[in-house]
A protein has these predicted regions:
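Bacterial Sec-dependent N-terminal signal peptides
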Residues: 1-23
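Short, aromatic-enriched amphipathic alpha-helices that serve as compact interaction elements
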Residues: 20-35
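Short solvent-exposed beta->alpha transition segments
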Residues: 22, 43-80
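Solenoid-repeat scaffolds in large eukaryotic assemblies
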Residues: 38-39
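A mature extracytoplasmic/lumenal domain signature
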Residues: 43-45, 53-55, 83-85, 97-100, ...
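Surface-exposed, charged secondary-structure patches
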Residues: 65-104
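Short beta-strand edge/turn micro-motifs at domain boundaries
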Residues: 104-132
């Protein structure tokens, strides 16, 4: 009798981790291909976005335009996640390096759990201090 609740909790945890990994994978794939439309599909309605030295809270439509300009000026070649963790508020975060034709950028994004899924609440694309 006691095994059923434990199994249900375990299954819910596994499903939550898979949803989180799926969103992370979609973000990485959109960054690799330079697809702002696919990227903003993973965002909360108003995202905290930093691209190079410009930072503000933008709607998805505004963020898509900003990211389109960035990808046009810096065509992506590859992206690799180097670190992942959890903030003190329970948000998952990922840090990676985006390699473009013009150089390297450090990418950080935070995932927030919203109802039954995860969404990107913050994305930072900053000049990388050390090219790989």
């Amino acid at each position: 009798m006691n095994r059923i609740p434990v199994l249900l909790v375990g299954m819910l945890l596994v499903l939550g981790l898979r949803a989180q990994d799926a969103v992370k994978d979609q973000v990485v794939q959109a960054m690799k291909t330079g697809s702002p439309k696919e990227l903003v599909a993973q965002f909360i309605p108003n995202i905290d976005l930093t691209v190079k030295e410009v930072s503000d809270v933008y709607s998805r439509a505004q963020a898509e335009q900003i990211l389109r300009k960035f990808f046009n000026e810096n065509p992506p070649v590859d992206m690799v996640i180097e670190h992942k963790g959890e903030s003190k508020f329970g948000d998952k975060y990922y840090i990676g390096i985006l390699r473009t034709r013009t150089g390297y950028f450090r990418v950080t994004f935070f995932l927030k759990r919203t109802e039954d899924t995860y969404q990107v609440k913050q994305l930072r694309i900053e000049n990388s201090k050390n090219d790989l």
